[in-house]
Amino acid sequence: IRREENLSIRKFFWIVMAEVIRLTSNDRTSTFKLHARSPEEIQNRNVSALNCFKIVSKRNIKDIASYISVLEEKELIKNGKYIKNAEVKWADTSIKIKSKKKFNLLVTSPPYGENQTTVTYGQFSYLPLQWIPINDIDSTISIDYLKSTQEIDTQSLGGTKKLNIEE
């Protein structure tokens, strides 16, 4: 993947690889949290990461082709390119949005609160993110989010509570 020069193609294959890691690792797929399979289950598993990579790649290519067909039907593709603007920004939810731009959609982590048993998207993402170079994701973000399996969830909920201390 790293030898591919085209960033869009690399990103496609990083997505494939992320799913392959989830499907073939020794982590249980029955939960979003990182829980190792039992030693017996690990010993008895017969999975091929390479075969899984091929299957997921082919499925995702088919899905993209189907999506492109829908965009073409709606005349949103011209000369092989999407004609609308889409901009994605990485932001910190604890800091005020400083922009004069208008936006149609703001996506945030769901408000799943302080409960330690809630869905942990960070743990779900942690293993695949160990493989993907930060510059292929977004060069403006810090890799501090990988310092522990809980850090992504902490950051996506606005970090830790800050006390107002008067000097």
Positions of predicted regions on the chain:
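Nucleic-acid modification enzymes, centered on SAM-dependent nucleic-acid methyltransferases
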Residues: 1-164
